[in-house]
Amino acid sequence: MLYSHFTEDLLNLQGVIVKKIKKIENIIYIHIEMPVSEHICPICGEKTRYIHDYRCRTIKDLPAFNQQVVLIYRQRRYVCHKCGKRFSEENTFVPRYYQITRRLINEIFNKTESVSSFSLIAKELNLSVSTIIRIFDNISYTSPSVLPDVVAIDEFKGNVGDEKYQAIITDPKSGIVLDILTDRKQSHLIQYIKRYSKENRDNVKFFISDMWKPYYELSEAFFKNATYLVDKYHYVRQIIWAFERTRKRIQKKYGKQNRLLFKNSKRILTKRISKLKDEQRNRVENLLYIDDELRKAYYLKEAFYKILDCEDRQTAKKKMNEWVYAAQNSGICDYRTCSNTLINWQNGILNTFDYPYSNGFTEGCNNRVKVLKRNAYGYRNFKRFRNRILHMFSYQKNKNKNNEKEVA
């Protein structure tokens, strides 16, 4: 009765007979059997209960109470009285040819959805790193069979194989990672996009990217019916970069005290003034009093932030044209360069005032990928890296019927 209760409540192996439990050092050994039952011969289909022999299998299970658990499974082999075929009895807790339980395999799959390294997972489950990797490599993720109506693309620094950057394709509307590509080269992107039919590509309504020209050219060439949107973070960053270049150039004119004052105030100078506390606002006003050019650059930056509050494209276009004119006539070289960039990308920028999509979800995925890569000290195998990323977001992918998880 004690063993039965232990089985039901702790082992959760219903239908298994626990014969003996031993603890040696930090390992719990549980000796188990299956009850005798009628089996069907895999060759002729005849029913049999004849036992041929037994063999003991040592099977690793989930740790319990911070200790390793090992099942000693006395497995029967049945024999068919009609054709003589010998075969092992069926069980639900360990796959054929494996030395670990199904639930331990499932725990490996669950833990690899996190950003933990294979080494850390192996340590937590009392398994070797090679076992974790071998189990994980049974997972494969296919590319989506069709593209959704909203497609976003970005890159991250993966340094896998011979390529420095890998591309990530997402559906920000549904919050799904669609695919990871070996690189962001235009030739490879074109080759990938051509997998999808023209009809499917024509059904894509929105295409979102940063301000990298090959992405825009990809949108123009293959997603002719899609509205192109420049990610908000990237065009706002152009303004911040222009202001920062101006600040760094100006602070070099001054002595050590003021130079350090400008440098140490970087965060509050780039932050929107409406989000500053009173004490921070006073500090900013004192800094702007020191230099006229810095003051002009600061108010140009703030004027652009106000454009972001516009509720429609027409208002934003009017405000942006005014801002571009002011920037080009400001006498600040960094803002002239920045304003030219905004002119070149104006249509994609203004589209963001009509539609709610951005690359925010994609950037969030990139940040998580960076943590994964850092924890593992990098990846050399792209296929494994791709599967790990897609598996990490599999709770989202499972909502999409076009992406299937295949476990061998």
What does each model-found stretch correspond to?
Residues 45, 58-162, 201-202, 349-350:
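Short, positively charged, Gly/Tyr-enriched micro-motifs
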